[in-house]
Swiss-Prot record:
High-level lineage: Bacteria, Bacillati, Chloroflexota, Chloroflexia, Chloroflexales
Pfam families named in the record: Cytidylate_kin (PF02224)
Coiled-coil segments on the chain, per record: none
GO cellular component, one term: cytoplasm
The protein's name: Cytidylate kinase
Protein's gene: cmk
Binding site for ATP: 11-19
Organism of derivation: Chloroflexus aggregans (strain MD-66 / DSM 9485)
InterPro entries: Cytidylate_kin, Cytidylate_kinase_dom, P-loop_NTPase
Catalytic activity reported: CMP + ATP = CDP + ADP; dCMP + ATP = dCDP + ADP
Amino acid sequence: MRVPQTIAIDGQSAAGKSTLGALLAEALGYLYFDTGVMYRALALAALRAGIDPDDEAALSELAHQLVIDVTQPTVADGRQYTVLVNGEDVTWAIRSPEVERIVSRAARFPSVRREMVRQQQLIGQRGRVVMVGRDIGTVVMPNADLKIYLQASLAERARRRAAELRSRNIDMPLEQIAAALAERDALDAHVSQPAADAIILVNDGLTPAEEVALVLNRFVYSEQALENGH
């Protein structure tokens, strides 16, 4: 009997994946791993090397040259994890506006994604990790001990996204946010589905603390989960 050592969190856009992942990892003493940081690390390396973010061949070659690692925080400066590229701490450097501008372009190529997934899987194999991102339960960690797929109503997700934007001094009409999320949902319906054995968690009306408590009590520490070897 054991507590899940690998936890995969996927779900709809703005459903609260990162919030749940970070709080759950903190409660368990696990690594919180937002897989998007891998692509940010690659984008930073491309900027430094002068590589065009639209050049798939060059980006793929660069991705294979990089060793990207994500660990528990090594510095008490507010970070949730430490990101290393070939041994260099780039945790804050990958958050620059320059990286932000090109990361989605660098991440869209299949050959790049395959290499990033390979490196994500290496981190997942260590265990004691809560991994958050797209296709985590189906592609990156299909054998994860616990898979959670988050869903919430469009209205709830729009409200949360609006609050997040306001915290960054960005004011956007709720209707515009909802329309953008609906468009994203339509795109995701063709490319991103929950794993067959994922727990579908609808979190409308739940605070982050309530959601973490629910997951811990019902799916992590429950008698049934332990009896199943999870």
